[in-house]
Structures are given as C-alpha cells and as structure tokens.
Amino acid sequence: MATLFIADLHLCAEEPAITAGFLRFLAGEARKADALYILGDLFEAWIGDDDPNPLHRQMAAAIKAVSDSGVPCYFIHGNRDFLLGKRFARESGMTLLPEEKVLELYGRRVLIMHGDTLCTDDAGYQAFRAKVHKPWLQTLFLALPLFVRKRIAARMRANSKEANSSKSLAIMDVNQNAVVSAMEKHQVQWLIHGHTHRPAVHELIANQQPAFRVVLGAWHTEGSMVKVTADDVELIHFPF
C-alpha cells in the first residue's frame, strides 16, 4: 500500500483536460491508497464555500466518493484556495490540516506543507500573505456579495501575474535556510511540498543528517504525485 500526495492542480473551468485527468486519478490510483493528501492549490481560485460553481460541486462529489470508499482524504490550504472552508471539506469528505503537519509514514517522519511559506526571499508576497490571512479581513471578504468577491479575486490574480512577471525565478523559489529551519523545528528528514511548480528531489543536511526535500509538480500537461511506501519515496509524473 502507499500514501499519495498531490498539489497545484489549479482546477478551473478553462482547463477541462486537467479536470478530466484528476477525475480519472480519483477513480483509479487514489482508490488504492492508504490515504490521499492534497497540499494546496487544488483550485485556481476560491472565493468562498457558498460559490455555486458547478466545478466545485463536481469535485466535492468525486473526492467524497474516494473518502467513502475507505481512503482518508486530507487538505492543506494553498495560496490560491486558502479560503476553502469547513463546509466544502464536509461536502468532499476531506479533513482540513494546519499549514505544517508532521506524519509518521512507514517508519519515516515526514513534514508536509503547501510550500509558499518557504519562499521568504519574496518579501512582497510574504507581506501580502500575512495581510490576507488575517481572520478579520477574511471574515469581511466572505461577507461581501458573491459578484463583488469575484471581481476582487480576478483583480488580485491579474495583479499577482503582473508582479510575478518581473520577479526573478530565484526569488520565487524556496529559501534554503527556511527549509532547514522548518525541518529542524519539526525534527524531520523528509519534507514534501508544492507551490513552486519545480518538481524535484533535493538532498540537503538537516538536524546534522542527510535529508530530502521532495517538490510536487503542477498539473499542467501531465499529472504529478509523490508516492510513499514502506520501501521508497517516489516523485511520479503520469499522463492525464
């Protein structure tokens, strides 16, 4: 058996091939797992659990079917869907996890997270993140009419795209000191995260021992998952 991790699907109506690929994954590989962990940015945007978007209802039903089949499903918020709440989690049968979670997997201690908090060199993004994660601001935003939230979200995505176009790739990647600090804080030798869209397995030193950082890929033209078993930790890419 295996535990599966995915992230950065960025599901939206404009990318039906990704949605179809995810549905096939849920109906196939996910049903064989010990557990499924979604490490953020499942959706391209999330403006509230009350959004009647048909795609959201479709995904809730598909994930719920996996959960009902006996495979526990877990979710860590990403920078795109940090407002996903308890209502959608209940409808989809997912358990919401904190932004950093340590798992005991087949004899390994593994830290999982979305990964945006590791990109500490991007001071502008971190300041924005701190602002939009303020509970009072989230409460205020979610109280706005749905059409207003949609306009705000569209403007924020456009601003983010424009800002990122002028940033260096290095600034938008993780900071190595932040990585080591997180792994040493939690006393782990394994870290699995997404966010950067740069799939790879990195070797480093943490806790004065060899350690590994496994980065999930985004679902653009193919699927990406990390498969953890008693024998191995594999980063796997597969066609939709």
Swiss-Prot record:
Cofactor(s) needed: Mn(2+)
Bilayer disposition of the protein: Peripheral membrane protein
Residues annotated to bind Mn(2+) 2: D41, N79, H114, H195
Keywords assigned: Cell inner membrane, Cell membrane, Hydrolase, Lipid A biosynthesis, Lipid biosynthesis, Lipid metabolism, Manganese, Membrane, Metal-binding
Pathway(s) this gene product operates in, as recorded in its UniProt entry: Glycolipid biosynthesis; lipid IV(A) biosynthesis; lipid IV(A) from (3R)-3-hydroxytetradecanoyl-[acyl-carrier-protein] and UDP-N-acetyl-alpha-D-glucosamine: step 4/6
Single GO term (MF): UDP-2,3-diacylglucosamine hydrolase activity
UniProt binding sites for substrate: N79, R80, D122, S160, N164, K167, H195
Compartments reported by the entry: Cell inner membrane
Enzyme Commission number(s) of this protein: 3.6.1.54
Catalytic activity of the protein: UDP-2-N,3-O-bis[(3R)-3-hydroxytetradecanoyl]-alpha-D-glucosamine + H2O = 2-N,3-O-bis[(3R)-3-hydroxytetradecanoyl]-alpha-D-glucosaminyl 1-phosphate + UMP + 2 H(+)
Annotated Mn(2+) 1 binding sites: D8, H10, D41, H197
InterPro entries: Calcineurin-like_PHP_ApaH, LpxH-like, Metallo-depent_PP-like, UDP-diacylglucosamine_Hdrlase
GO biological process, one term: lipid A biosynthetic process
Annotated Gene Ontology cellular component terms: cytoplasm; extrinsic component of plasma membrane
Task of the protein: Hydrolyzes the pyrophosphate bond of UDP-2,3-diacylglucosamine to yield 2,3-diacylglucosamine 1-phosphate (lipid X) and UMP by catalyzing the attack of water at the alpha-P atom. Involved in the biosynthesis of lipid A, a phosphorylated glycolipid that anchors the lipopolysaccharide to the outer membrane of the cell.
NCBIfam families in UniProt: lipid_A_lpxH, PRK05340.1
Family per similarity comment: Belongs to the LpxH family.
Name used for this protein in its record: UDP-2,3-diacylglucosamine hydrolase
